[in-house]
């Protein structure tokens, strides 16, 4: 499988089309999360001037230039929306559409390695901001279009399996919660202290060193 290195700027074009005529209202406002999805903003948009808001159509890439290193980039596959003027919006140009699968490009952007590259390029900046010019300078290894489509199909299948697994876990959690609630209501109460003992074993003889030190986080890991 041959890879071709391309400069992204040769295959993308920026869009600055805004909502200057106020055609679109607050119901179409979205933002981009660090998880790479569009979401409705939490703030109250009433009274906000929507004229500078950028119009986003199907096929657009939208990213936050100050949070791209955290994964704040999304690919628009749904209908039209509008985003803050602070976001950068771009599309594949005609040349890009011929050789780049947009979903493959989005998968590339979502990689941790890409986030690290953004961080590296921003290093030393007083106010780290990944401009469209910076995005254009990105060089990516690109497999043939058919191979990109295969990667996308495998990736989407893995996501579907993961979501199915997560739904199964939620169903199992509901069953367990119901079972525990039934026990709480019907089983006789007993003191937990009758079944547990404290452990105060201390590393006096230094059998264990720094590599053995562990803590407990909020996820109980």
Feature map (PLM): residue ranges:
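Non-catalytic DNA-recognition/assembly elements of restriction-modification systems
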Residues: 1-19, 137-205, 215
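Short, solvent-exposed alpha-helical surface patches in well-structured domains
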Residues: 104-107, 117, 137, 150
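Sequence-specific dsDNA recognition surfaces
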Residues: 5-20, 24-61, 193-221
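A short beta-sheet element
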Residues: 58, 62-110, 221
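Short clusters of hydrophobic/aromatic residues that line enzyme substrate/ligand-binding pockets
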Residues: 30, 73, 118, 130
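Internal, well-ordered alpha/beta segment that forms a basic, Gly-enriched binding/recognition surface
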Residues: 114
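A short glycine-rich beta-alpha junction/loop motif
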Residues: 81-88, 123-149
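A generic structural signal for well-ordered coil/turn residues at beta-strand boundaries
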Residues: 69, 83-86, 134, 207, ...
């Amino acid at each position: 499988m041959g890879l071709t290195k391309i400069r992204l700027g040769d295959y993308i074009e920026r869009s600055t089309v805004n909502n200057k005529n106020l055609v679109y209202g607050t119901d179409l406002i979205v933002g981009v999360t660090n998880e790479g999805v569009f979401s409705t903003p939490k703030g109250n948009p009433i009274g906000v001037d929507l004229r500078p808001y950028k119009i986003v159509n199907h096929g657009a890439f939208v990213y936050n230039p100050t949070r791209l290193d955290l994964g704040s980039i999304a690919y628009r596959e749904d209908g039209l929306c509008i985003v803050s003027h602070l976001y950068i919006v771009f599309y594949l140009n005609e040349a890009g559409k011929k050789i780049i699968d947009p979903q493959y490009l989005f998968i590339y952007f979502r990689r941790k390695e890409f986030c690290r590259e953004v961080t590296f390029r921003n290093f030393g900046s007083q106010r780290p901001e990944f401009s469209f010019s910076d995005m254009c300078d990105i060089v990516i290894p690109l497999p043939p279009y058919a191979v990109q489509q295969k990667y996308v199909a495998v990736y989407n299948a893995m996501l579907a399996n993961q979501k199915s697994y997560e739904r199964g876990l939620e169903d199992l959690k509901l069953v367990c919660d119901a079972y525990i609630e039934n026990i709480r209501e019907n089983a006789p109460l007993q003191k937990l202290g009758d079944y547990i003992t404290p452990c105060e074993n201390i590393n006096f003889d230094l059998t264990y060193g720094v590599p053995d030190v562990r803590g407990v986080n909020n996820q109980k890991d």
